[in-house]
Amino acid sequence: MNRSIEAINERAKRGFSDFLQLDPSRARARAGGLSDWLVGEVRRAIADGRLPTGSRLPASRVLAAELQVSRGVVTEAYQRLSENGQVVGHARAGTVIAAVPAPGQEDRPASKAAPEAADLFEPAPGAATFDLLRSAPAAIDLFPGLPDLTAFPRSAWLRAERTVLADFAAADLGYGDPSGAPAFRLAVTRWLARNRGIQADPAEVIIVAGVAQALAVLARVLGQAGITRIAVEDPGSLGAREQLRAWGVDTPPVLVDDAGLVVEHLRRSAASAVLMTPAHQFPTGVVLSGERRRELLGWAEDGGLIIEDDYDAEHRYDRAPVASLRAVAPERVCYAGSVSKLLAPALRVGWLLVPSRYHRAAVLAKRDTDLGNAVLPQLVLAHLMESGDLDRHLRLVRRRHRRRRDAMIAALRRELPEARLQGAAAGLHLMINFTDGLSDVDLAAAAFGRGVKVQPLSWHCQTPHQPGLVLGYAATPVRAIEQGVSLLAESYRDLQPAGE
């Protein structure tokens, strides 16, 4: 049984006026008797979720004594609720909530309708619209940003958690180091050395609640140091840009072409820091070329600061791994990564490495935010990293993600040959462009109307670019990918001018 229902039923044994804040004195000031008042109060509690289906009402004798009213008042109210179908009586279970009130029987907040495409697909959405679309249901979800969540290693996680708890000291349940659990920071340094070529001391690592919090910490720390202008890639992640702007940071756009971020444009931006995704640029999938890396590091040596978002570098299929910028210039690069694309974003665990001059301020900023991440998940993740279970999981999902990527590429070539495809050599998404001037927002809205959720490329652009879509494939089965691309192609054809 649902725990919330169990809690309600436990209260019901004692009478529940404390739970619903029932006050019979209020009823005497209203038209109608006490039974009318009690019926209305119970209906309101059902409608707003305080009494979910399956929860038990207190016995009439108990509730009457609690409210100091006659038992007949409660019995009559229960009878009326039963006649209207809101409750049902069981010999042993007592009186149980059966359903919400029928329309018109109770003044209750109207349930929210499913969002319409017109409400979701704005030309320039803010974070609220972006989050609303992320959570909006769709028959086929091709929204980027998720790994295959069905592959989450539940058995390995449970084994690791049992192992950790067996050695968990009472002192471990207290307030920990705001930088993170030492065992996890050590495991992170070994993981980064093994997978990203980064050599770091555990003391350099700050555990954060994902890259989003890493950016919030950096915005605060760099702002204190007088850096309030951080250039961002264009196109580049809308979510990251919104996170920086929420902290009052100016985010001038810097063009990304087929070789990555254009460093000459970065110099012209007059920004003293830049946020970028060099290993697998979001959303284009471009890898920063060797020549651009040298130019960028030269810019950093002249006083610039690089913020490296290494969000999905472990997922690669058709190319060799790309070295992290942090591995080359640790005093010029802030590095952020997480387990969101490795395991699941719901874990809210990531890591941040900063140049030594910012480290103390970053630790204090993290401490002031939340006193540090939860310790138990950190220790479980440390065990997964050190035992090899996380490496095994990564190998498994790489194969699965690759099959899904291949299915999407084949479907796009078959159904949408007009689209230019790029960024498919690594990651969890790819990008397509169109050359006919079609509005990508209109196309995404039309696809959503057919039950397919995709992301317009223009949402991630601050300056005009070719229209396109960002398509996630890692979290979607092959058959659904094929169906989704077919429906997307139908939407594309429907938006073409007549006669074409």
Residue ranges and their predicted role:
Residues 87, 250, 305, 453:
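Residue-level detector of anion-binding/catalytic polar loops
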Residues 147, 278-282, 341, 476:
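Short glycine-rich anion-binding loops that position phosphate/pyrophosphate groups of nucleotides
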Residues 1-162, 363, 367-373, 382-385, ...:
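N-terminal basic, amphipathic alpha-helical segments
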Residues 310:
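Walker B catalytic acidic pair
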Residues 161-303, 314-328, 332-334, 401, ...:
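Conserved core of the PLP fold type I
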Residues 157, 334-398:
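Conserved core segment of the aminotransferase class I/II
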Residues 418-421, 453-459:
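A short linear hydrophobic-aromatic micro-motif
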